[in-house]
Amino acid sequence: MLKMNQKFDYENNKIEDKNIILELTRNYIRNYGPDLLAKNNSAPVSGKVVGEEEAINLVEASLDLWLTSGRFNKKFEKEMAILLNTRYFLSCNSGSSANLLAISALCSDQLGDNKLKEGDEVITCATGFPTTINPIIQNRLVPVFIDAKIPSYNIKTNLIEKALTNKTKAIMIAHALGNPFDLDKIKKIATD
């Protein structure tokens, strides 16, 4: 068992070591970060943007041994709840998980007559990712595929109204390759 002064030394050493590691991380990103980015001068359709602050938070979370939903995630969820003016906010590990949670929640018995039921149609984009389409199928709903515009690969909003039937209960689409779809038009179709 640690004595009081040993515990104090342990905590002080832990904090000092952590600060050294974080300072080394800052120096590494400042000195070598631009070189790491310059090696790949192409413009990828997706990827990561990691600056000094993100690198520090990543290393600090690793030192806390919280690699998923630790204090940084709790802070993020609190700030998002405030930003969205909602009581709760729950983050997901990926957009794939978020899509599955969203569709599954819409199939919940807690929604009563408003829940999505087996066989209900869900409009989606023909060029959608499997992670947008799979939750529809997993919940025994019927995807109705709408063609996409080239070169954005987003849904052709003018075709949505033509696809509506009495079995259409939802629209589930994702922005394609960072290109936002016409949200205002989709909202208008959904609320009319």
Residue map of PLM features:
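PLP-dependent aminotransferase class I/II
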Residues: 27, 48, 74-78, 85-89, ...
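Solvent-exposed, non-membrane alpha-helical residues enriched in polar/charged side chains
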Residues: 59, 63, 77-81, 103-104, ...
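Acidic active-site catalytic centers that drive phospho-/nucleotidyl reactions
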Residues: 54, 77, 147-149
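Generic alpha-helical secondary structure signal
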Residues: 53-58, 71, 75, 131
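N-terminal "arm"/small-domain region of PLP-dependent enzymes with the aminotransferase-like
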Residues: 2-67
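PLP-dependent aminotransferase-like
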Residues: 108-192
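Phosphate-binding glycine-rich loop
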Residues: 71-121, 134-139, 145
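Conserved donor sugar-nucleotide recognition element shared by glycan-biosynthetic enzymes
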Residues: 69-73, 95-99, 128-129, 153, ...
